[in-house]
Amino acid sequence: MPQGETFHRAVSNVLFISQIYGLLPVSNVRALDVADIRFRWCSPRILYSLLIGILNLSEFGAVINYVIKVTINFHTSSTLSLYIVCLLEHLFFWRLAIQWPRIMRTWHGVEQLFLRVPYRFYGEYRIKRRIYIVFTIVMSSALVEHCLLLGNSFHLSNMERTQCKINVTYFESIYKWERPHLYMILPYHFWMLPILEWVNQTIAYPRSFTDCFIMCIGIGLAARFHQLYRRIAAVHRKVMPAVFWTEVREHYLALKRLVHLLDAAIAPLVLLAFGNNMSFICFQLFNSFKNIGVDFLVMLAFWYSLGFAVVRTLLTIFVASSINDYERKIVTALRDVPSRAWSIEVQRFSEQLGNDTTALSGSGFFYLTRSLVLAMGTTIITYELMISDVINQGSIRQKTQYCREY
């Protein structure tokens, strides 16, 4: 690992891209020195993020108005939840931005322990490359999903226009299909479409980026636990002096405090992200028993969106759970310490390792460990069995009519 490969330098470009969508409005996010990172209430980034928040909040108000005037059903409630989740994600990233300068300075201080001898010999984790790979894969897949859903909307709006003989232009039909809540209060103008698409992206981007951000945090923390484990594994079954175990234990406690600091800061984001992912997966599974459509594009967009949500959730768990995985490896390594080398320091270290779970959590409701996969899988299978029993599959027919009532 290069001597200067800190988490801040590895993740700075990713955070800069997120600021394009109004997330984490921190000044000097790409600064070489963490001391230069600032959160200023009167800054262009804050004003830009505030503008995006106002636009999203205004559209949320239009959605509420639409739901009240039309009806509350399964579909409109999912639209409401989408905007609520989006607004909460922006709010939680604002909350995190206020704490981010302090977090980065604390993180940088802990990292200095692992950027010098002997840890530099155990540093092939390559934080930056891993973060870039995760970000590229997740956000590229999210872009494909967004394009498929847009293409799906274009197709369905055109089918509605032609089948139902609606006397509107092609682009107005898209506006009517994509934004029925705005169509009720704002007449169509072509110049509105690029603005609405940009607002749409600021709503869609945080859903995937939040998972990506959690993975980036997990990679940064796991890299240091990996170094600590490698140092302990290097002295496997060797007799080491007490000063060695004292130093290793103190470094572990520094990492543990850092995990607790990060967990307190991003726990609301973790809870929101996994709650949203689970509800979306269950919603799509429910829709899979209902009318999806006979068109290839409709089917492709539906199943890709569902598959992407499942894979993204699993990837987030596996990446973030690597923190806990390395701690468990350290526990295993301590069990192999020879009895003649066992000391008070090793005993204290062993007890501190077993005190509690070292992992990111969703505000204490769950921890990002590998066992979470089994828990979520069991929940989804139970839900699938329940709805398959409730819904009469014999009455399901493929959707061939696209006319909607407003």
UniProtKB/Swiss-Prot annotation:
Protein name as it appears in the record = Gustatory receptor for sugar taste 64b
Residue intervals passing through the bilayer: 48-68, 80-100, 131-151, 184-204, 266-286, 291-311, 371-391
GO cellular component term, pick one: membrane
Q: Which UniProt keywords apply?
A: Cell membrane, Glycoprotein, Membrane, Receptor, Transducer, Transmembrane, Transmembrane helix
| Main location (coarse class) | membrane
What GO terms in the biological process aspect are recorded for it?
A: monoatomic ion transmembrane transport; sensory perception of sweet taste; sensory perception of taste; signal transduction
**Positions of glycan attachment:** N167
Expression (tissue specificity): Expressed in Gr5a-expressing sugar-sensing cells.
Please give one Gene Ontology molecular function term for this protein.
Answer: ionotropic sweet taste receptor activity
Which of the residues are on side Cytoplasmic? Answer: 1-47, 101-130, 205-265, 312-370
One Pfam family in the UniProt entry: Trehalose_recp
Q: Which residues lie on this side of the membrane: Extracellular?
A: 69-79, 152-183, 287-290, 392-406
User: What family does this chain come from, according to its entry?
Assistant: Belongs to the insect chemoreceptor superfamily. Gustatory receptor (GR) family. Gr5a subfamily.
Its biological purpose: One of the few identified sugar gustatory receptors identified so far and which promotes the starvation-induced increase of feeding motivation.
InterPro entries from the xrefs? Gustatory_rcpt (IPR009318)
Coiled-coil intervals:
none
Its membrane topology, per UniProt?
Multi-pass membrane protein
| Cell compartment(s), UniProt | Cell membrane
